[in-house]
Amino acid sequence: MTQAASSQRAVYWGTGRRKTAVARVRLVPGTGKLIINDRPGDQYLQYQEALLASVKAPLELLGLENSYDILVRAHGGGVHGQADAIKLGVARALCEVDPANRGPLKTEGYLKRDPRAVERKKYGLRKARKAPQYSKR
């Protein structure tokens, strides 16, 4: 494949994770469509404007919201966790598009993986930290 042909069919990949959600994000030059698991993004995110804005935030920061189509395969977790995973995947894919994008994305915190996850339940306890009532006598 020649250099010109490869630049026209440029596809940029990014993987994002949050809690138990994993999103494999593909950025393709286009008009700004969002497709998640073969469904329109607004439908998949249950028409929640905050989640839709969160997913597109890295693109809007760089002024590229109408330059790339976002194609996503997401699994695990719930809608909120998947939205955060998609946001991280989009930011990582934008770093592949142009390494100069890394600076602004990093200062806004879009390249940080949120490490918080559910703490496991321990035996002898009711929940992760809740102990049964203690009676001295």
UniProtKB/Swiss-Prot annotation:
Gene3D superfamilies membership: 3.30.230.10
Keywords: Ribonucleoprotein, Ribosomal protein
Basic residues: compositionally biased ranges: 123-137
Gene: rpsI
Keyword Nucleotide-binding: no
Listed GO CC annotations: cytoplasm; small ribosomal subunit
Protein name: Small ribosomal subunit protein uS9
Biased composition (Basic and acidic residues): 109-122
Lineage: Bacteria, Bacillati, Cyanobacteriota, Cyanophyceae, Synechococcales
GO MF terms held by the record: RNA binding; structural constituent of ribosome
Any coiled-coil regions, as ranges: none
One Pfam family this sequence matches: Ribosomal_S9
Region (Disordered): 105-137
PROSITE patterns (alphabetical): RIBOSOMAL_S9
Family designation: Belongs to the universal ribosomal protein uS9 family.
GO biological process, any: translation
